[in-house]
Regions:
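Sec/Tat signal peptide C-region and signal peptidase I cleavage site
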Residues: 19-25
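N-terminal targeting pre-sequences for secretion and organelle import
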Residues: 222-265
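Gly/Pro-biased beta-strand-loop elements
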Residues: 89-197, 223, 252-333
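Bacterial N-terminal signal peptides
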Residues: 8-18
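Primarily a LysM-type cell-wall glycan-binding module
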Residues: 26-59
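Loop/turn positions that initiate beta-strands
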Residues: 78-83, 228-231
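LysM (lysin motif) carbohydrate-binding repeats in extracellular/periplasmic proteins that recognize
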Residues: 46-76, 117-119
Length: 334
């Protein structure tokens, strides 16, 4: 219990809660820094809004909101409930170039060439049995008003549900690829970054392998990203950083499940040799790290050894330290 209370206090201190802001654009930190953004607080206004509506307002994915607010009803969160909006994050450990997709955190990072900024978008990715692969590739084609040609496997899966798909779904409002698509050069070009015609599925595992964005996000990205842009897709459920001031942070997301029986809240997370060294360092608080690995809040947690942690009310600490399993959706769309 003591380590849980210390972890909860550290989480609230390190998240930098501030007044609401809605931009997904962040100034690029120095090369030796990876911490960006500030978390926000928002209050559920009534009993008529789903968590997806609130998440979309702040440009957050649904599972990201659930990680940050365990136990919240995703369909009808209770009016007056105070929610943390997870807008603080650590940049992935990759080159700051082009597009970087981190599957585990269900986010896409875009580094515009020659600009000192990074733009972050929530995404939907491949479901169980149709996972989005890890890769390094590039944008090979930009397609406005795309048609959708379902693969034979996709048509078979739909047929099992009693849905007969046409060979080609024409462009328009009924097309699940939305109004914009960018084809990836990998393999035969079956993977795309595209929009959606649905009002759900962002920040979830719902696609047939493609990377999906909300309509306004894919339009902005489509209009900004040139053909040939580098795209790196990674799977890093744990990110960590030592900032220029010496402070140490760890950000833990629920890992991607491998089957229907996996619980992303409790399934093991593989730790790299470098991460193990980070954890064992005398400059790191191993108890705070252990709590962060269990909590999997999806937010950076300050884990420096010897950091002063202010006291908070026991009920606040208990709520912040609560661990709750959140499943991953398997709705099937492109």
């Amino acid at each position: 219990m003591k380590s849980a209370l210390r972890f909860a206090a550290a989480l609230l201190l390190s998240t930098g809660l501030a007044a609401p802001a809605f931009s997904t654009e962040y100034p690029l930190p120095a090369p030796d820094s990876r911490l960006i953004g500030e978390n926000q607080l928002t209050t559920v206004p009534d009993d008529k809004q789903s968590l997806e509506v609130i998440a979309a307002k702040y440009q957050i994915g649904l599972l990201g909101m659930l990680e940050a607010n365990p136990g919240t009803d995703p369909w009808l969160p209770k009016a007056g409930t105070q929610l943390v909006v997870p807008q603080q994050m650590l940049l992935p450990d990759t080159p700051r170039e082009g597009i970087v997709v981190n599957l585990a955190e269900l986010r896409l990072y875009y580094y515009p060439k020659g600009e000192e900024k990074v733009i972050v978008y929530p995404i939907g990715i491949g479901q169980l049995g149709a996972a989005t692969p890890v890769m390094v590739t590039s944008i090979s084609q930009k397609i406005p008003n795309p048609t959708w040609t379902p693969t034979p496997n996709i048509r078979k899966r739909y047929a099992k549900e009693g849905v007969t798909l046409p060979a080609v779904v024409p462009a328009g409002p009924e097309n699940p690829m939305g109004l914009f698509a960018m084809r990836l050069a990998r393999g035969s070009g079956n993977y795309l970054i595209h929009g959606t015609n649905a009002n759900f599925g962002i920040g979830m595992r719902v696609s047939s392998g493609c990377i999906r964005l909300r309509p306004q996000d894919i339009e902005a990205l489509f209009n900004s990203v040139p053909k040939g842009t580098r795209v790196q897709v990674i799977n890093q459920p744990v990110k960590y950083a030592i900032e220029p001031d010496g402070k140490r942070y760890i950000e833990v997301h629920q890992p991607l499940s491998h089957n229907d029986k996996d619980d992303p809240q409790t399934m093991p997370i593989a730790l790299s040799a470098a991460l193990k060294t980070f954890i064992k360092s005398p400059q790191s608080d191993s108890e705070l790290i252990k709590a962060a690995l269990a909590r999997r809040s999806g937010m950076p947690v300050l884990v420096s050894s010897g950091e002063a942690v202010e006291a908070q009310k026991p009920e606040e600490a208990q709520q912040s330290a609560q661990v709750s399993a959140q499943g991953q959706a398997t709705v099937e769309t492109p």
